[in-house]
Amino acid sequence: MKNLTNEQKEFLLSTIRDVPDFPKPGIVFKDITTLLNNASAFTMLMEHLEERYKEKNIDFVAGIESRGFIFGAALATRLGIGFVPVRKKGKLPYTTISEKYALEYGVDEIEIHIDAFRGEGKRVLLIDDLIATGGTAQAAAKLIQKTGQELVEACFIINLKFLNGEEKLKKLTNIYSVLEIA
């Protein structure tokens, strides 16, 4: 598999906009919409992910709400496999299975349809745009495993390494980040 060069990584990083003090003071939000509307960057990223995963015999890509839907659905289409949305509680119309996770001030919950993977033992790739503290990704990984699936890897476009989010996932699955911000 061909890795991205440092020049390619720098190009991708240059297409991501920093938005200071969003959603609250002191946070620098990584806005990927500027990567998405750059056809060269989005194509390069999707080609890289397709190359990485095309030989891994993955059955489904599961994307975390909401930006994980964008990358996950695009990758699933390129791989010719199904896509499963991991949603916030109350957003799916059919019977669901859920997993709770801790927030800074409280608890949140994500869910998938009970029949999302059409049986057990499927090979699943989890994807999201960014890993920060890792709480949502950890809950999504547990949720996938709770349904009897094999979680092949958790993939993130951006890893904010200084927040140590990957520590919560290391015991559950392999982790791959396209871009890392120290």
UniProtKB/Swiss-Prot annotation:
Q: Which domain of life is it from?
A: Bacteria
Q: Does the keyword Cytoplasm apply?
A: yes
Q: Which GO terms describe its biological process?
A: adenine salvage; AMP salvage; purine ribonucleoside salvage
Q: Name one GO molecular function term.
A: AMP binding
Key words of the record: Cytoplasm, Glycosyltransferase, Purine salvage, Transferase
The terms describing its cellular component in GO are:
cytoplasm
The record's similarity note reads: Belongs to the purine/pyrimidine phosphoribosyltransferase family.
Protein name (record): Adenine phosphoribosyltransferase
Task: State the organism named in the record.
Answer: Nitratiruptor sp. (strain SB155-2)
Q: Which gene encodes it?
A: apt
